[in-house]
Amino acid sequence: SGRRGGPLREDEDDVALNQSFVAWNPYRAGDDHVTLRAGRQELEFGLSRLLSTREGLNTRQSFDGLRSFGRLGRWNYNTTLVRPVETLPGAFDDRAEAGGRYGGASVWTANPLLPAGNTTVYANHRRKRDVPFDIGRGTDLRNTFGIRFWSVNPALDYNWEGGVQRGNFEGLAIRAWYFASDTGYTFAGRAGRPRLGLRVDATSGDRDPNDGELNTFNALFASTAYSGLAGQLGPANANDVAPSLSFSPRPNLRVTLGAIGFWRMSPDDGIYSATGSLRRDGQSSSARHIGNQFTAQLV
């Protein structure tokens, strides 16, 4: 595969059933509705910062379990109780992760205090065995509490999100945090509708391997496109700054040019991949700067 350490487990899956579920709508009145869903399904919420279909790798992420979502009055809601599906290389052999689980709930509504804004609050729980961190591997029990402010205003668009994580990792208290933002302004009256954008993200890293805490942020099932379409780095012990310019030279073409700079949040913690594996330990270098990436995308 050309990858150091060989192919990832997610790189091969001959034939798989990504989605197979039953759905029921027990309530519908005007715009209000409730949907219940059970079975194997893909899940993706918000900007995929914590839960996504793993777009960018060779196989997609599915989940087995229950989901309820809908709208009641001015409130939208989503709840899930599922087990992640492990990717295996054969035909129809993917299975629910042993000892793993994921559950979460979120509500969102329009926010009159923000320009064309909306607010989402959420909480989730994740249990996973054999999770790799710079301090070692073990069972990770983690609760995430977050809030997101977002808008799809034709001129000013923004997505700002942040939160904390608490839990336990092999007797260590988990105390992690994260912040993510993507802000842009589109000059709708100009030729090509140019958009200037700026993304700034920061995720905590472990400060001291001997203080009885684990401070490394766990991005759970985040989109692998965090570090661009190549998906080489993940949002753990990292911060980045990414300016961009988008424009349409013709009606059916959108061009985006950008640059991304990556740094370690803590020089005492390692560098993590988009799937959460440890790519470099924190003891081999004290440098914070990881590297830069330049991107060009035509859609």
Language-model features: locations:
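Flexible internal linker/loop segments at domain or repeat junctions
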Residues: 214-235, 266-284
